[in-house]
Amino acid sequence: IGDLQVPDSNGVRLPKGFASRIVARSGHDYFGYHWHAAPDGGATFATDDDGWIYVSNNELNKSNGGAGSLRFDKDGELIDAYSILKNTSRNCAGGHTPWGTWLSCEEIDEGQVWECDPYGKKDPVLRATLGRFNHEAVAVDTSTMQLYLTEDKRDGCLYRYTSNSIDELSGYPDLDNGFLEVAEIIKGEIGALHWHLLPDPQAKDTPTRKQVSQSSSFNRGEGIWFHEDAIFFTTTGNNRVYAYDIKNNDLSIIY
């Protein structure tokens, strides 16, 4: 792509040939939607008219959070804006699913994950089986349909969700019927992982990160992504980028 150039008029450094523009401002109205404050994690979704939808989380606390969508036509013009999730708290990051939904994660101690329709046509659905903890982000392994989740705590953990059933027609997992596991690095800071079944994903008495004594801590887990049979995730507390080779069960630090 090329080296980053000096900051443009918006303060954004981009490669040569790229340009930035502001498409929405917090507190302004667009097509009847009051664009939310504290925009955070987001993703884009292609539409059948060759345009796209940009989904953005709202990280306000105390049930003032949620998520909203901006819809663009094929020429990049904004043609609609609307809410897709309301009355949640500190929706930080999340994840784009292969089946075209947005998983919005609450970054609070009792946080949960909400599955949202980018088009705003369907009501958001609470996916309680993904656990209650200080959620940050989630990525889907498109080979196994397992979900990997990060936790934004200094002693946070890495989690994996496995569905008990995969739809025969779509090939997609049931997010209401499955189990959650937590990772243990067997020796040292890298290498093979062991996945322990989480006793109580709803954390009724004990936080999930403290339920399994062998679980390994990651210093403020952040963004996570699946690419070519590997899970990549970052940690803010020590500025690391991890890569988990799923097939070979090997965790490494690449930055």
Placement of each model-derived feature along the sequence:
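Sequence/structural signature of beta-propeller domains
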Residues: 1-255
